[in-house]
């Protein structure tokens, strides 16, 4: 089985990489509109390349723990195969319009400063090459675009990923919440009715692929989990963090430009 050959480009992306086996052209007229972050689970680039090839999967870029960046596909013309069944902001099939970036990480450890520093450089480069790509609003985790997937859902890039640090650098958004807010439970697995329906509508408005069912179903749980991981809004000591708290509601309200707690209080 042939392997994709990477270009080592000193950590800054370009659009001259050779096409590997596991890719397809982007649809005509489609340009990247989001960047999707995932992690490898595998310990190094060699191991992750073997896993990707076995699965017929691919990403545009891989960033190693020491900050080394390798490019595998042209992010302007090629769709890599990393998202599968996915959606973002109502658009189905994220591979068609996303740029996939994988960080070497075992899903349990902190991300090294060198790696995150290189990611920031990469994201800055992307914004310069694609001025219409809004990475304050359209930088997402793989888990966020695959919440509507059956079975074992993705949670990448996980709770260790430093979303706050990236937001401080201008990539993504982050809002501080208090321990008191995190400890106040609003909705949980056995919740039903209008409050759940309103939460589902708001998560969908934010961009997640959930539907309004008025029950705290599997896809709502997955959406709440990755939201809590990203914004640090989960119920203290709950693992996985699938309950909805006042902290989560506060952040979601700010993300949507709404009054804090307006939805659940009026439901």
Swiss-Prot record:
Residues 10-19 have a biased composition (Polar residues). It catalyses: Hydrolyzes the link between N-acetylmuramoyl residues and L-amino acid residues in certain cell-wall glycopeptides. This is Putative N-acetylmuramoyl-L-alanine amidase RC0497. Its EC number is 3.5.1.28. Belongs to the N-acetylmuramoyl-L-alanine amidase 2 family. Residues 33-141 form the N-acetylmuramoyl-L-alanine amidase domain. GO terms for biological process: cell wall organization; peptidoglycan catabolic process; peptidoglycan turnover. The keyword Cell wall biogenesis/degradation applies. Its main location: secreted. It is found in: Secreted. Transmembrane segments: none annotated. It holds the Pfam family Amidase_2.
């Amino acid at each position: 089985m042939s392997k994709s050959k990477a270009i080592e480009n000193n950590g800054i992306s370009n659009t001259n990489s050779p096409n590997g086996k596991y890719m397809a052209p982007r649809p005509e007229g489609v340009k990247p509109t989001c960047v999707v972050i995932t992690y490898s689970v595998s310990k190094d680039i060699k191991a992750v390349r073997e896993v990707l090839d076995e699965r017929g999967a691919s990403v545009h870029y891989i960033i190693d723990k020491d900050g080394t960046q390798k490019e595998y596909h042209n992010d302007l013309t090629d769709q890599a195969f990393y998202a599968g069944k996915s959606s973002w902001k109502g658009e189905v099939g994220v591979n068609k319009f996303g740029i996939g970036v994988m960080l070497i990480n075992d899903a349990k450890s902190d991300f090294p400063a060198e790696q995150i520093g290189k990611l920031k450089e990469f994201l800055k480069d992307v914004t310069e090459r694609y001025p219409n790509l809004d990475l304050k609003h359209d930088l997402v985790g793989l888990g966020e675009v695959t919440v509507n997937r059956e079975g074992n859902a993705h949670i990448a890039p996980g709770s260790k990923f430093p979303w706050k640090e990236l937001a401080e650098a201008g990539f993504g958004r982050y809002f501080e919440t208090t321990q008191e807010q995190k400890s106040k439970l609003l909705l949980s697995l056995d919740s039903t009715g209008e409050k759940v329906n309103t939460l589902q509508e708001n998560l969908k408005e934010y961009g997640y692929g959930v539907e309004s069912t008025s029950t705290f179903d599997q896809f709502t749980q997955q959406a709440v989990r990755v939201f809590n991981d990203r914004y640090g809004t989960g119920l203290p000591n709950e693992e996985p963090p699938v309950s909805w708290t006042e902290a989560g509601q506060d952040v979601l309200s700010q993300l949507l430009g709404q009054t804090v707690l307006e939805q659940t209080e009026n439901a």
